[in-house]
Amino acid sequence: ADVPGNYPLDKDGNTYTCLKLGENKDCQKVCKLHGVQYGYCYAFECWCKEYLDDKDSV
């Protein structure tokens, strides 16, 4: 089953890019900013587990 989640957006509506795939401290910080406890770097963009609201940019 697919785990729900999404790519959070910054205040300019862009995804957060990342260089280190998989576990990524920067992505963890980004996801926590968006109220989600866990995330990682996938396809060079931060992806947050169980993050559903892509309109809540920070």
From Swiss-Prot:
- What's the main place this protein lives? secreted
Stretches of the chain forming a coiled coil according to its record: none
Query: Any keyword Transmembrane?
Result: no
Where in the cell does this protein reside? Answer: Secreted
Tissue specificity is:
Expressed by the venom gland.
The record's GO molecular-function terms, alphabetically, read: sodium channel inhibitor activity; toxin activity
Cystine bridges: C18-C41, C27-C46, C31-C48
User: What is this protein's function per UniProt?
Assistant: Binds to sodium channels (Nav) and affects the channel activation process. In mice, causes hyperactivity that persists until death.
Family statement: Belongs to the long (3 C-C) scorpion toxin superfamily. Sodium channel inhibitor family. Beta subfamily.
| Name of the protein | Dortoxin
Upper taxonomic lineage: Eukaryota, Metazoa, Ecdysozoa, Arthropoda, Chelicerata
